[in-house]
């Protein structure tokens, strides 16, 4: 399994003892004489936690409103962890179908790993009043209906609902964080692996045995705990959980692969798929196949997907199977994601005939510059529904694109596309022109681009407009019910 390097915690005993004691953690003697540290319950939520108006920043609004579990350090978000509605809008499902068909045209089978919520999995940790108020049966019913809808669009969809209402330890989720623990990742990977094995393309993927080993302990000050601390001026102890790594059986250290070939299965997703929780490793062990893990912290729904689609790894050697992990909190109807993904999946304007091109130098403190004009040299037909743009900055660290598009009718569109700040980027943005509702028939006139935020030196920007890709799945590709 190819992954990024991970860090794990193994502090000196004295330093650890001091730090843990300061965080409300006590040590108990064991028969071996070695101390075992246990976090004591910390805090009760204050009245501000129950007031949605207390959650003032955009980040904090994602935690409205925190409620305390039957142990004080178990916290839940009522809007997200205790939700009973899932899925997306008709437009969101239409976009998901288009994305599936585009991947299918490249010979890629897509697997959606849709995580059950913390409330569905850990409802036994709720206080009696919240336990009674949370409509678990409705949540599971709607969750399964969403999985079925994904499947009808052509995706392969493992059903993780057997993991709900768990009463086993170690827990699936952290007490005070939205991430799953390594144990939650492992239990999910078992189910996902069985679905992947059903895909006909999996039969042609080389097999390899993997083994998973414990590598130490991970310390986490959870997202729920941090927000509660801001609201109530409290400090929760670090929560510790086992951390694992996976390697080919019989091989230790060195090259994890033994060869330089790319795996034929790729994992994209949120920070849940990052190396901290070893989800990719567990998948490799249970599938018996290598995985290219391109997920990274801070990726969100689309970050690792878009970065991977723009990479040489995907463009020159697309995988046979792409596993896409995300949670229900993300908006699957977000048009900006699909506009970028459907453009980059075909490498945007690379290899396509350029209809319009322009360049400009953007300088700190200056206003935006017009970089592309239809009719300056020649007038071309450039309706939104049939075209895309490919934009490249000379500085690869640019992570935000802002600008305005004008149309022949006089209408205009302000646009903004962002990349995660937690990963290296290449300065390239590409997207299909806006085509929903009455936008599709508009004809492009001009584009203005703003200097990037925090710009200190002049930067060059080049823009190309070309026809968008027309994805038609070849008939000889494996079909599945709903395809």
UniProtKB/Swiss-Prot annotation:
Belongs to the AlgX family. Disulfide bonds join 46-232, 349-466. It comes from Azotobacter vinelandii. This is Alginate biosynthesis protein AlgX. Its main location: periplasm. GO terms for biological process: alginic acid biosynthetic process. It is found in: Periplasm. Its EC number is 2.3.1.-. Monomer. Residues 350-480 are annotated as: CBM domain. Keywords: Acyltransferase, Alginate biosynthesis, Disulfide bond, Periplasm, Signal, Transferase.
């Amino acid at each position: 399994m190819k992954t990024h390097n991970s860090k794990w915690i193994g502090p000196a005993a004295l330093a650890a003892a001091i730090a843990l004691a300061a965080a409300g953690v006590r040590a108990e003697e064991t028969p071996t004489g070695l101390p075992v540290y246990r976090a004591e319950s910390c805090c009760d939520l204050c009245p501000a936690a129950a007031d949605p108006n207390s959650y003032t920043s955009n980040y904090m609004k994602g935690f409205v409103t925190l409620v305390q579990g039957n142990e004080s350090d178990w916290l839940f978000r009522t809007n997200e962890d205790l939700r009973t509605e899932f899925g997306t809008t008709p437009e969101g499902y239409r976009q998901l179908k288009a994305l599936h068909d585009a991947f299918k045209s490249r010979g890629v089978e897509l697997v959606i790993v849709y995580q059950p919520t913390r409330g569905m999995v850990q409802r036994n940790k709720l206080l009696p009043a919240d336990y009674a108020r949370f409509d678990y049966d409705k949540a599971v019913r709607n969750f399964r209906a969403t999985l079925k809808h994904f499947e009808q669009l052509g995706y392969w969809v493992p059903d993780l609902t057997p993991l709900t209402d768990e009463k086993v330890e170690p827990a699936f989720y952290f007490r005070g964080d939205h991430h799953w623990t390594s144990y939650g990742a492992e239990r999910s990977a078992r189910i996902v692996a069985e679905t992947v094995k059903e895909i006909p393309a999996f039969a042609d993927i080389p097999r390899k045995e993997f083994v998973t080993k414990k590598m130490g302990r991970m310390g986490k000050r959870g997202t729920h705990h941090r927000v509660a601390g801001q609201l109530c001026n409290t400090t929760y102890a670090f929560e510790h959980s086992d951390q694992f790594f996976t390697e080919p059986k019989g091989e230790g250290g060195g090259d994890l692969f033994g060869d330089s070939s790319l795996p034929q299965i790729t994992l994209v997703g949120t920070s849940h798929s990052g190396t901290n929780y070893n989800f990719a490793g567990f998948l490799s062990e249970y599938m018996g196949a290598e995985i290219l893990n391109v997920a990274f912290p801070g990726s969100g729904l689309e970050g690792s997907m878009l970065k991977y689609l723009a990479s040489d790894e995907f463009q020159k050697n697309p995988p046979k199977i792409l596993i896409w992990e995300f949670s229900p909190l993300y908006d699957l109807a977000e048009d900006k994601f699909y506009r970028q993904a459907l453009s980059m999946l075909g490498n945007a304007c690379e290899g396509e005939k350029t209809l319009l091109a322009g360049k400009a130098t953007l300088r700190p403190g200056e206003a935006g510059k017009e970089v592309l004009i239809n009719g300056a040299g020649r007038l071309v037909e450039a309706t939104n529904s049939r075209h895309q743009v490919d934009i490249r900055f000379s500085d690869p660290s640019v992570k935000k694109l802002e600008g305005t598009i004008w149309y022949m009718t006089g209408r205009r569109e302000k646009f903004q596309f962002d990349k995660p700040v937690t990963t290296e980027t290449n300065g390239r943005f590409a997207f299909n022109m806006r085509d929903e509702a009455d936008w599709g028939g508009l004809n492009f006139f001009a584009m203005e681009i703003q200097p990037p935020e925090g710009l200190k030196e002049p930067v060059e920007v080049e823009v190309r407009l070309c026809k968008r890709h027309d994805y038609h799945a070849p008939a000889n590709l494996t079909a599945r019910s709903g395809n």
